[in-house]
Amino acid sequence: MTQNTLAVTQTFFYSHIHEYEESKIFLIGSSHFMPLNPEHMEKFILKDEVYSIFNLAESADNPNTRIRQLDSIIAADPDLIIYGLNYRDFSENSSTDFLLPGPKELIKQNVPLDIPSFLDNPKLGTLSAIRDFFKVETSGNYEIKTPFFKIEEYLFPIVTNKQLNKIVGSDMYIPIKEKNKQFQNFKSMMMKFKENNLKVVVILTPIRESSIDKISQINKDNFDLIITAISVSLNISVYSLMENYEDEEIWRNTNHITNDVPGLVFSEDVAKIILKEI
């Protein structure tokens, strides 16, 4: 993949990542990984060696889209890659119910600036964003640690377990691994990472039991076979947090942990896994 296939935010991040001399850890995944707080995790894993953690999660990400960044990730030479996966990462028609914010929220999240009138004048809003982008993203603080998404209000509200239990999930089609394009692209990335001596660990991200129950057994089995192939055939360590936090009120919907303070337990559990792997 060439650099010009990347979004502006991606190009900017990868072109500046070498300014960080510390050992680097990349968190890669979809919106399921957005609750992970890099600064909190850095304090949690503080050791003799200093690590800079970057949460590269993106809404609706999957292996088919992430592979566009493959060359850039390799060039960045992270010391460890934590890749978050769940059922939808290997599905072909996963429902977006309760998975993604609305269109306005998605635009706000992916436009580098907060532009209230963006939808009224998209052209002007886009030009303003490009003009001011570099002023916003070069601060070197929490924003550069979450370069591909903005910390928006919709990431914080906590839904009670009683309310969550009323939400009905839906099935999703997960092809067998031999015909699964998502898995084939994931496998290609993992092989390239290995060729370049990059260490990868997979974490299965949390999901409420009510969502899992709506997935048919054949699709669950296909997912399990894919995860087994990742663990055995690709020789990648896989940690599952899928069934964690079921009874804890830290969810903003059935598939996502809140970015608010109660959700930091997710960051801490991933940090514990990092400590085992570094």
Describe each PLM feature range.
Residues 1-24:
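N-terminal secretory targeting modules
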Residues 85, 99-196:
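Secreted/periplasmic serine-hydrolase-like ester/acetyl group-modifying domain
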Residues 153-155, 190-215:
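Active-site segments of SGNH/GDSL-like serine hydrolases
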Residues 253-278:
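Histidine-centered active-site loop/cap adjacent to the catalytic His
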